[in-house]
Amino acid sequence: MRTDSADASKAAAVRQTLSAGPASSGAARVPAIGTQRTCASMAGVKAASKEISRTLMKLLKSRQGVPVETLFGVLGSLAGFSCQMGIRDEYSRRANALPPLHVVRTLDGRVFYFGDALNEMLAESQYSVWSLSASHARKLGGTPPDLSAIFAHVSRTCGGTDFGVPRFPEGRPVKDLPVDYVRTFWSLIQPAVQKHCNGPSEWHIAYGLAIQAAMDVSKAVIDPGAALEIVMECAVPMSKLDPREVGL
């Protein structure tokens, strides 16, 4: 895939940013995503997923190609973060409604977010990030990782120095942290997602479909199960991240 000069400049800026690192309740649940979706709705989600894939391929491509570990790290980070941001956006449209997110404050002053609505989009519904990604990994012959162990690790490290530091498959290192990926790529990718999707409850689905597409094109160079492990090691902690930590 070739890029024009503007894309090349933007891609170079993104790589430089990642290498440098970062700069200095009881409300009702979000309605479950139904098993039936309209053709028009899915068309928008699919268009959004294609934009995610196209843009990331351009931004991440170097002379050596697209590093697949980084690709899945970015996709997982954005997918997880989109679950929380989708809930926030949905409830911002409702008068006097607080998002159903449970706030956890640590001794060092950091804030993290948990809750059933978050888990539903991330791992429990038919169209959750996990459901879409794991089912496709199995279809391609991969073995999904132990998701409960990933959740347990994130909960155990919440507030500590190991929070948001993924444990990647052996031989599959990813250079940057998930929070760096969110900080760098969210503002570049999310506008297209919002443009095509029918609402915030579909954002995470678009990222899930983009993860499926990435598995399809990379299955010859990375086992789909390993790709899925990278995705979820990034997605779970980023779903709980305080948006203020990335300037939102």
Which stretches of residues belong to each language-model region?
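Solvent-exposed interaction surfaces and binding hotspots enriched for charged
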Residues: 2-248
